[in-house]
Amino acid sequence: MASNYYSVQIKQCIGLGARNQSRYVKMIHGNIIRALPYPETFLYNNIVHAYALMKSSTYARRVFDRIPQPNLFSWNNLLLAYSKAGLISEMESTFEKLPDRDGVTWNVLIEGYSLSGLVGAAVKAYNTMMRDFSANLTRVTLMTMLKLSSSNGHVSLGKQIHGQVIKLGFESYLLVGSPLLYMYANVGCISDAKKVFYGLDDRNTVMYNSLMGGLLACGMIEDALQLFRGMEKDSVSWAAMIKGLAQNGLAKEAIECFREMKVQGLKMDQYPFGSVLPACGGLGAINEGKQIHACIIRTNFQDHIYVGSALIDMYCKCKCLHYAKTVFDRMKQKNVVSWTAMVVGYGQTGRAEEAVKIFLDMQRSGIDPDHYTLGQAISACANVSSLEEGSQFHGKAITSGLIHYVTVSNSLVTLYGKCGDIDDSTRLFNEMNVRDAVSWTAMVSAYAQFGRAVETIQLFDKMVQHGLKPDGVTLTGVISACSRAGLVEKGQRYFKLMTSEYGIVPSIGHYSCMIDLFSRSGRLEEAMRFINGMPFPPDAIGWTTLLSACRNKGNLEIGKWAAESLIELDPHHPAGYTLLSSIYASKGKWDSVAQLRRGMREKNVKKEPGQSWIKWKGKLHSFSADDESSPYLDQIYAKLEELNNKIIDNGYKPDTSFVHHDVEEAVKVKMLNYHSERLAIAFGLIFVPSGQPIRVGKNLRVCVDCHNATKHISSVTGREILVRDAVRFHRFKDGTCSCGDFW
């Protein structure tokens, strides 16, 4: 009797939130240990099963080991524990040890592979079962395989399973027919989905929702609306229509659909709320979002995890992070989705360090990340070039098995590329079993950032040969690589192919890349002609690019035109004043320099101060020119003095042509010596052990003199120095730079 009582208690815990479920199961388990010295096997099995569903494989194993004579249910529950936890090697080892196997055993094995994204292994296990143990085949097995086919877009596999469904006579069963319909609808095979739909003996609202979802996913809006108007609708139906409209770029119509549901007086639940909020976020419609938030509070859904997560996402997309944080802090229960919404929200609004902190807090709270959350955390590290935390997350990806997901691998390729470790980025890319268009684009962008045009173009060509269609980001990387390598004609060719071959309408960013292509090569007149032929005027980036090139080439005429155009576009943009001032200074026109400075003061235009940073032992050390705030100031300045003497002996000659002050030459030289990147490099030489590269970031373009000085520093110290400035990566080693002095 006692065993039955405790068994019921454990079963009642299943379905509670992760935190409560864990607490109550462990509490009941403790009571069992104290009250029952020899629990019955079926009670042990229920405890193992509960721990399995909680992904607590360690506890599940401990309980299993206490069972005197484990039966098949015991073994299946242990197998389930490893399956749910993603511990594939332990799952396989347990499977091999099983004294007997039934349909549940095979289903758990196949589902374990499926949950870990190991499609090939799941298919192999299924085929083995069909060949040698077909008697164990159940409708659950077929349902699992259909879900696998659907989530991974494997149409041929899905059709193979469909054939077996027909052969076994399961086609009319809802348990199989529902995932079969969903599979076809999800992969866009609408005609097949309709055949399954009309072949079912009983069609419920779930079936209608699946078919409607497939129509919406294929952009067949009118067909979906026709089905929607004639069907019996539940809240999921309304939510699916709202979500489908939003995903087809009809966010306003999605919000209107929500209003129609509300006007009809239909009962609101988590599904419509969770679908309309992303539409508000996509439009940046904060007022509508706040109104829906008020409706959520009135209907008492503010504590629902799904709704709370959607609210966080909406506020983050509307750049209202303080509202997002308020919603998050007030949530009584949080799951991986709500934590992920915060990580993504902070990461995509430029607050990457806080995003990483939120991710670490999530792990401390006992919630394991999924592949999407981990991928977003790694992306946040990439955005701030934080290789230290990113490498730790790489380790987490390996130990958790999430490395097999393409989203995680893509983020790691991007991380190492953005942190200047192009070798590790390439190695990871080559090791990927599955690559999508994002994988190739990440690698193309990494090579482009390093100015390795040949590799960039070769990789792009391979991507196209593999049948993957490049997007605007991919073409940006290719044209940028051509620009940094001075391959003007190739860059022009790829720009033309965007429209003619790939159907991509060039954005303002692509036009800026083309301005950069001409400007870097000194073909300033061609850049000017290109600008005059554009369908719209350049943005600030385009004008600044041309103006920077005019400064480097000393072209006052075109530089003045670019500066005046930039100032007209944005009177408070400092680049128009500072870059033109630099051209005047290089030509000794100090009166013109003074006039520009007066104009800046009158309009309250402030130049963005140059800042460089280096991360060491988890702490970010930032420096500005002539910085006196560092606690290591004396050591840094002494190191700079020592370096300056060594590089002068090595042939370094200061270039003061772009110093904007009318002062003595010696003063100009001294000003150059204490630029922010040199302070950061000196810090690295003092504290970063030899054998490790020194990694420095800078918010502006590295000046010509500091670039030259850093080459000499790498020569006299024998150290590898990586500098990521606003333009590209520079890898200084043995007196040379990876950019070939072209940046």
From Swiss-Prot:
It comes from Arabidopsis thaliana. The keyword Hydrolase does not apply. One of its GO terms (biological process) is RNA modification. The keyword Repeat applies. Residues 618-648 are annotated as: Type E(+) motif. Residues 542-617 are annotated as: Type E motif. This is Putative pentatricopeptide repeat-containing protein At1g68930. PPR repeats lie at residues 40-70, 71-101, 102-132, 138-172, 173-203, 204-233, 234-268, 269-303, 304-334, 335-369, 370-404, 405-435, 436-470, 471-506, 507-537. Belongs to the PPR family. PCMP-H subfamily. PANTHER family: PENTATRICOPEPTIDE REPEAT-CONTAINING PROTEIN. Keywords: Repeat. Coiled coil: none annotated. Transmembrane segments: none annotated. Residues 649-743 are annotated as: Type DYW motif. The gene is PCMP-H22. It comes from the Eukaryota. One of its GO terms (molecular function) is zinc ion binding. Gene3D superfamilies: Tetratricopeptide repeat domain. It holds the Pfam family PPR_2. InterPro entries: DYW_dom, E_motif, Pentatricopeptide_rpt, PPR_At4g14850-like_plant, TPR-like_helical_dom_sf.
